[in-house]
């Protein structure tokens, strides 16, 4: 059964919107899990609370995404969410397997970098959505710059970025180790994006639309997928570099 025809999903919502909402909501769920886990064994109470706040914000953003595709028919929201996320249930499995770590700071950076790439992908590809629903999706996915007092609209990883920046500034050895780890993680994350595009042709179409609206001149026909992939990887790499800069880590 297609997520678009599942119980509780508004049948008037275009299929590309349901597709992207499902992926974006799944990345928020993954971000929640990572931040909540890191909160449990955080080094101090303030850090524990900051990461818990970020985890809570991930679920709030996920609920906002579900609301964009939900029909007002009494179906439990969690059922709707599971239906639209189901096609992406294993999308992070290989990435997680390749980036296992027991180190607390490296685990936190894995979420910031890896899940950050996935969330950037959703935000960029959302540029290919038409109409008012497309604008609504983009509004949910847009994120203000992180800081020590991230607002309610900031990304779930805002506190994590700020915490890692403080840790890197205080310990040059740790900063070097995290920079090296970040390079490995982003490589795996970009590989994940490539696999995802190969599995979900709808996302390639959205990526092509987003690129065209930003003035990119991509070839048509059989070369489109490769061109879209290259364009997206370049954009995602730029976003990753800026994210690492905010953490005072070399990309």
Language-model segments: residues:
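C-terminal accessory extensions/subdomains outside the catalytic/core fold
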Residues: 193-251
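Conserved alpha-helical segments that form or flank metal/cofactor-binding pockets of metalloenzymes
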Residues: 55-88
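N-terminal capping/interface segment
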Residues: 1-29, 41-46, 67-78
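Helix-loop segments that flank and shape redox-cofactor active sites
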Residues: 31-52, 115-132
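Internal, conserved structured core segments that host functional sites
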Residues: 89-155
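Acidic/His metal-coordination segments adjacent to aromatic residues that form catalytic metal sites
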Residues: 2-22, 86-111
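Alpha-helical scaffold segments that form or flank carboxylate-/histidine-based iron centers
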Residues: 16-21, 45-60, 107, 132-149, ...
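A contiguous pocket-lining binding segment that forms or flanks enzyme active sites
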Residues: 125-194
